[in-house]
């Protein structure tokens, strides 16, 4: 039986990423987030309106999404808990500037996505940054011989929890290709 559950927030398993942006004070910077989704060539990020990232991204019009693996968890926390500081200096992470945007790609992350701002939508104390994906880069070990993404082999950090506690979770090796269960069912019905 289900029960009404009162909480200020609920995170039901979102990938953790470094949001990269040009920063007038530090040159280039990052912050940690887990509020994003992507559809086709659109990327939407949710952030606090008064945060440094929203201020700088609204000025410069570019950002990157950099997806770390589990071994960067300490850097994830450092970048997420130190507001308005030089996160590259604090974490020891390195970057290169994107080819299509003036924002940093975190070298230690196996996946980076370059985005150009299309629109900023304020919703109370939060801002949705809507961007157009201009370039995606992926470590070669995550591409097969045809250049296709080996999604079943990538294990991002997942963020899950509620107002009383939040946790990092990791994927296991179990992966099922989308559509394979329907195909199997149809094959059995033949």
State where each predicted segment sits.
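Basic, polyanion-binding surface patches
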Residues: 1-190
